[in-house]
Amino acid sequence: MSDINVMALASLDEISADDWDACACPEGMAGAGRPNDPFTTHRFLHALERSGSVGPGTGWHPHHLVARAGREIIAVAPLYAKGHSQGEYIFDFNWADAWQRAGGRYYPKLQCAVPFTPATGRRLLTKPGYENQGQTALLAAMIEISQQNNLSSSHITFCTEDEAQAGTQAGFLHRITQQFHWQNQNYADFDDFLGALSSRKRKTVRKERDTAANFGGDIVALTGDAITPAHWDAFWQFYQDTGARKWGTPYLTRGFFD
C-alpha cells in the first residue's frame, strides 16, 4: 500500500460530499455491520458550518482530517479546535480547572466529535477494508497536531468500542461515562410496554397520553418538501424556548434548519 498522508481541512467546503461520505456512509455499510449514521454525513456536518452553528465566534473551529493512500481518500474524521467544553455532553470542566490551577492552559483542545450530538457512532470514518490503517493514521495525526500546536490534549467522544480500543493502543486514555438508553424488550404493542411498568408509572403515562390526545388540535406528520419555512420558524421558536430552560443552550442557528 502507498504511504498514508493526512491533511487538515478548515472547512468541509474543501472536500466533496461524495469523497467524505465514501468513508462516513459507504454503500453496503449496513450489510457489513456498520449502520449508516446521519450525524457524520457531509450534509449534516456541512450544515453546521454553513449555518454558523460552528465556526468563527462559536468556539468550534473545524480542523477535519483527511487520510489518503496515494490519491485515494481512505479515512476522514470530524475534528475541531475547541475554545471551551460546551456542546459536547461530556464534562471535563474539572480537568480544565485542575490544568489551569497547575499553571497550564487547557484551551484550545482538539475534539473529534459530532457537535451537540451525544449519540454513539463512528468518529474515525474509514472506507471498508481500511479500518486499521485509517484509524491508526487519524489517531497519529491528532497527536501530532496537538504536539505541534502546543495544545493541551486531544479527545474523541461518543466513539465506538473498537475505536476506543484503537485509541488506547495509540496512547489515548480510555474514559467511561454513563448514559441512559431505552431498550425495546420485544414489546408487542404499547399496552405490552405499559404492563412492564409499576402501577404508579402506568397511571402517569396514561394520564400524559390522554392530555396529549385531547389538547384541542390535530397532529400532522410532515416530511421533505411538505415542511415549509413557516413550519421551521415555528419549530425554531419551540427550540429556543426548550433550550432556554434548565440552563440549556440552543446551539443551532435558525439557518441550520433551512
Question: Model regions: which residues?
Answer:
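Short glycine-enriched loop/turn motifs at secondary-structure junctions
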Residues: 4, 118-119
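Short, charged/polar micro-motifs that form catalytic or ligand-binding hotspots
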Residues: 10, 114, 132
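Conserved acetyl-CoA-binding loop-helix of GNAT-fold acetyltransferases
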Residues: 106, 131-144
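Short glycine/proline-enriched loop/turn "hinge" motifs that connect secondary-structure elements
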Residues: 106-118
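A short, internal acetyl-CoA/4′-phosphopantetheine-binding micro-motif in the GNAT/acyltransferase core
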Residues: 119-131
